């Protein structure tokens, strides 16, 4: 009887809410690499590293409800003389099923929540690469992907507004 009192719009919203789906189908390593350009010399100098972290995400739509999200994380560790001690790169990927979301919600999910799910796997893989390469463990801090997404959206909006203003 409650359904009889709802407007058609409310019924549509309730139906949409019942159809929203999110699932992790698979998490996998798409690519990884480790280089020690200095070779054994990296172990003969005092260990005072400068760590640089480069982060990027890529979203590939596979079909209507399936997306591949790839978190690309590159760590470059340099010594005091700016020589690279090691370079480690991981492309941690996930296959996600998503249905029933509007475009803004979908974009936020794929650009924020999915990379946040993938990050612990990438962090562990990078740590493992470093220690297997003979270096001390990497202790990468957590990343706030939601804040990064919001920042990127604000920046895109500002650029769009500037592009529309006459010079």
From Swiss-Prot:
Annotated InterPro entries: SecB (IPR003708), SecB-like_sf (IPR035958)
Record carries keyword GTP-binding: no
Molecular function in Gene Ontology: unfolded protein binding
UniProt keyword terms in alphabetical order: Chaperone, Cytoplasm, Protein transport, Translocation, Transport
Gene3D superfamilies xrefs: SecB-like
Keyword Transport carried by entry: yes
A biological-process GO annotation: protein tetramerization
Compartments, as annotated in UniProt: Cytoplasm
A Pfam family annotated for this UniProt entry: SecB
Record-level GO cellular component terms: cytoplasm
Purpose: One of the proteins required for the normal export of preproteins out of the cell cytoplasm. It is a molecular chaperone that binds to a subset of precursor proteins, maintaining them in a translocation-competent state. It also specifically binds to its receptor SecA.
Assembly with partners or alone: Homotetramer, a dimer of dimers. One homotetramer interacts with 1 SecA dimer.
Record family assignment: Belongs to the SecB family.
Name under which the protein is recorded: Protein-export protein SecB
Gene source species: Teredinibacter turnerae (strain ATCC 39867 / T7901)
Gene: secB
């Amino acid at each position: 009887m409650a359904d009889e009192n709802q407007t058609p719009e409310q019924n549509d919203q309730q139906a949409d809410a019942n159809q929203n789906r999110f699932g992790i189908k698979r998490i996998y390593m798409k690519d990884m690499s480790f280089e020690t350009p200095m070779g054994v010399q990296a172990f003969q100098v005092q260990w005072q590293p400068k760590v640089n972290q480069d982060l990027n995400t890529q979203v590939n739509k596979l079909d209507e409800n399936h997306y591949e999200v790839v978190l690309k994380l590159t760590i470059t560790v340099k010594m005091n003389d700016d020589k690279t001690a090691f370079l480690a790169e991981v492309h941690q990927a996930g296959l996600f099923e998503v249905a029933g979301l509007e475009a803004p919600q979908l974009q936020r999910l794929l650009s924020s929540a999915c990379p946040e799910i993938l990050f612990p796997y990438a962090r562990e893989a990078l740590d493992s690469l470093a220690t297997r390469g003979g270096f001390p463990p990497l202790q990468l801090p957590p990343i706030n992907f939601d804040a990064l997404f919001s920042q990127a959206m604000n920046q895109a909006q500002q650029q769009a507004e500037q592009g529309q203003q006459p010079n």
